[in-house]
Amino acid sequence: MPGPLFLEGNAVTLRPIEREDLEFLHRVMNDPAVWRPALDIDPMNYEQGEEFFETVLSSSDGVHCLACTDEEPLGVLSLTGSQYGPDETSRSRAAEIAYWFAPEHHGQGYGSDATARLIQYAFEDRNLRRLEARVGSFNDASIGLLESLGFEHEGTLREAAWYRGEYHDMCWYGLLRDEWQSGQE
């Protein structure tokens, strides 16, 4: 059963990740359709899942949410490396946004809805100035999602990602708060 409501999108809700969600995380994070394109997810056993929950998901370094419809978990979204607050001179006020969804929920608009809501939270509630995202050049779905939400391709790290037996470029995307706000009008 997902935790209490944190944010609400059009079709999904975002909730804190709870210990009860570890079964879902374990199943999906071990699915090659998720960990291969994500590039930084390692397959894990239950003990490693517990450790991941304790050291990453339960830490105060970042925001980690479970995207759900009703009571069904769909995927995970995160804001990490965030430096936020009202003091514009001493903080960069930037964060990296990341997401992954269970394969059975791909292509249904849940990722776009959930990511848009987390972006809104980052800019309006956390006063961030910019968001960044990394994606392998082979991941057309994720690139399409980012671009549909206004992210701009800012650079490429050539042959920085190993995927399915080949090196691929790693693309860096960025979105500024002003760009997001003008796209919402």
Question: Residues of each region from the PLM?
Answer:
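Generic alpha-helical structural context detector
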Residues: 26-27, 54
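A short, aromatic/hydrophobic, helix- or strand-capping loop or linear motif
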Residues: 37-42, 63-69
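Conserved GNAT-fold acetyl-CoA-binding loop/helix
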Residues: 33-55
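Proline-rich low-complexity regions
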Residues: 2-6, 43, 61
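A short helix-loop-beta-strand connector motif used in the catalytic cores of GNAT acetyltransferases and
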Residues: 53-66, 73-75
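Acyl-donor (CoA/ACP) binding surface of acyl/acetyltransferases
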Residues: 1-23, 29-31, 68-185
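Polar helix-capping/helix-linker motif
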Residues: 31-32, 59
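Short secondary-structure junction motifs
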Residues: 36, 60-62, 128-130
